[in-house]
């Protein structure tokens, strides 16, 4: 392990935290970076634990809201309906993700060109949705009806294709189903908690026999960077999309997807 390895670990942790909660596909970015940089020194352990850093980032930022939800849950029907809605939205990904885990990790995650195509397609979709003259019916995540939550949950399953983006699919789905931009992003945050935690736990279980902490310093650096950058994004994203929408992320996807595709064609 040398300074370059530490720098690379910090960079990957930064990318995980910055891209996990915005609609640009953290998995797509990490797969492309891994393909072109060949970062394999920490393997599965590094991949799993930097994701934990992002999970803890959103839990820390939303700790006060989560505590309030827990306090209100026994006596407030609206809060109970909201929690049920998040769980209902989580179920499709939990079931389909468990059933298709081998195919997703073994086939889809080994196809960098697919990542680039999905980044580009998703970029065009974000730009299109951002320009639509939508009239939102839901301005607060607490008011999402259960059928809407279930529909968002099925739409989230599209993000099992690397490059689609979990947050991107849920945000676009929420917007098209009647949510305003701020609540769409916030519901994506709440849905991220069980979805990411479930994916983390499942990956940890499936990889339990190959996990290694030999490169502990790299794991710690990546974890810390994912946590810090994740906290920054979660704190500022809602205000940003309320004022500016999602066009920036659409262009971001188009640029990264096109650059990745060109690099794959030229260098493979």
UniProtKB/Swiss-Prot annotation:
It is a multi-pass membrane protein. Its EC number is 3.6.1.27. Keywords: Antibiotic resistance, Cell inner membrane, Cell membrane, Cell shape, Cell wall biogenesis/degradation, Hydrolase, Membrane, Peptidoglycan synthesis, Transmembrane, Transmembrane helix. The chain crosses the membrane at residues 3-23, 46-66, 84-104, 107-127, 144-164, 185-205, 213-233, 246-266. InterPro entries: UppP. Its main location: membrane. GO terms for biological process: cell wall organization; peptidoglycan biosynthetic process; regulation of cell shape; response to antibiotic. It comes from the Bacteria. GO terms for molecular function: undecaprenyl-diphosphatase activity. It is found in: Cell inner membrane. GO terms for cellular component: plasma membrane. It catalyses: di-trans,octa-cis-undecaprenyl diphosphate + H2O = di-trans,octa-cis-undecaprenyl phosphate + phosphate + H(+). Pfam families: BacA (PF02673). Coiled coil: none annotated. Bacitracin is thought to be involved in the inhibition of peptidoglycan synthesis by sequestering undecaprenyl diphosphate, thereby reducing the pool of lipid carrier available. Belongs to the UppP family. Catalyzes the dephosphorylation of undecaprenyl diphosphate (UPP). Confers resistance to bacitracin. This is Undecaprenyl-diphosphatase.
